[in-house]
Amino acid sequence: MVVKVGVLKMGAIGTALLVEYLLDERADREDIEVRVVTSGAKMQPEEAVVAEKLKEFDPDVVIVVSPNAALPGPKAAREAFEGKPVIVISDAPAKKAKDELKEKGFGYILINADSMIGARREFLDPTEMALFNADVVKVLAATGAFRLVQEAIDKVIEDIKAGKQPELPQIVVTAEKAVEAGKFSNPYAKAKAMAAFYIAEKVADIDVKGCFIEKDPEKYIPLVASAHEMMRIAAILADQAREIEKSNDTVFRNPHAKDGKILGKTQLMAKPE
C-alpha cells in the first residue's frame, strides 16, 4: 500500500522547513506519496483555505505544522480535516491547546525548543530570519528532536499500511526526550545536546518579552538580539555534541529502506540493518 501523506504549513517554525524530507531523505521510498501546501508566512483564519487544495489529494494522514497551534488559523486548518488522522506539529505556546487536541482526537508533537523568532522590524531582516532558522534546524537535528518527529510520523504510516486505526502521537518534546531519540553514546555529547535544547527553549521567553511586552525600542531591540545570540550558541553546542560522537565513530543513523522500514547503524562504515 502507498500511504498518501498531506502536509499543511501555516507560518514558520524550524520543523516546518524540513518535515516532509525527514520522511524520505533520499527520495526513494516507494510506500508513501507526499503533497505539501502552505499559506506562506501568514496564518490568519482566512489562510486556512489552502486546506481545500490539500483535500483534492485525499490524504490518508495529514500533518499540520505551524507556530502556536492554539491560534484560530491553525485551528481552522486542522479542523478542515476532522475525521482523518491529523498530527499537529507546533511549538511550546501550543501546549495551551493540548486538552482540546486530545478531546477532538488530533495527534500532536509540540517541540519546546522550536522557539519563536525575534520579529522586530528594527532587527529582523530576511538574512537574520534565515540565519536564525538555520540555527534552529541544527539544534533540532543534532539533539534528536527531528528523529523523534520522524519516528512518530513513521509509526502512524506503518499503522495505516497495516490496515490498523493509527495511534496518533501525543508528545511534548523536552530536552530529555530529544536526547533519548538522539541515542548519544558519550555522556558529554549528551550533556552538550541537552544544554543546546535548554538554551533554545529559553529563546522563546526572551523573544516573547521583546516582541509583545516591552514597548521601548531601547529595551526590546537588545532583547531580541540576545535571544538570537542564544540560539546561535545553542547551535554551536549541538554541533559539538555531534562532533564528539563522530570522533568516537558512534553517530547513530536511521535511514529509510525503499519499503519505508527504518534501518539503523552506528559505525560509519557499517551497513544499515
UniProtKB/Swiss-Prot annotation:
Taxonomic lineage: Archaea, Methanobacteriati, Methanobacteriota, Archaeoglobi, Archaeoglobales
**Activity versus temperature?**
Optimum temperature is 70 degrees Celsius. Thermostable up to 90 degrees Celsius, however, only in the presence of salts.
Q: What does this protein do?
A: Catalyzes the oxidation of methylene-H(4)MPT to methenyl-H(4)MPT(+).
Q: Which organism is it from?
A: Archaeoglobus fulgidus (strain ATCC 49558 / DSM 4304 / JCM 9628 / NBRC 100126 / VC-16)
Protein name per UniProt = F420-dependent methylenetetrahydromethanopterin dehydrogenase
Task: Answer yes or no on keyword Oxidoreductase.
Answer: yes
Q: Which NCBIfam families match?
A: PRK00994.1 (NF002162)
Q: Which reaction does it catalyse?
A: 5,10-methylenetetrahydromethanopterin + oxidized coenzyme F420-(gamma-L-Glu)(n) + 2 H(+) = 5,10-methenyl-5,6,7,8-tetrahydromethanopterin + reduced coenzyme F420-(gamma-L-Glu)(n)
Identify its protein family: Belongs to the MTD family.
Under Enzyme Commission nomenclature, its number is: 1.5.98.1
What is the enzyme's main class? oxidoreductase
What is the pH-activity profile? Optimum pH is about 5.5.
Q: Which GO terms describe its molecular function?
A: ferredoxin hydrogenase activity; methylenetetrahydromethanopterin dehydrogenase activity
Q: Which UniProt keywords apply?
A: One-carbon metabolism, Oxidoreductase
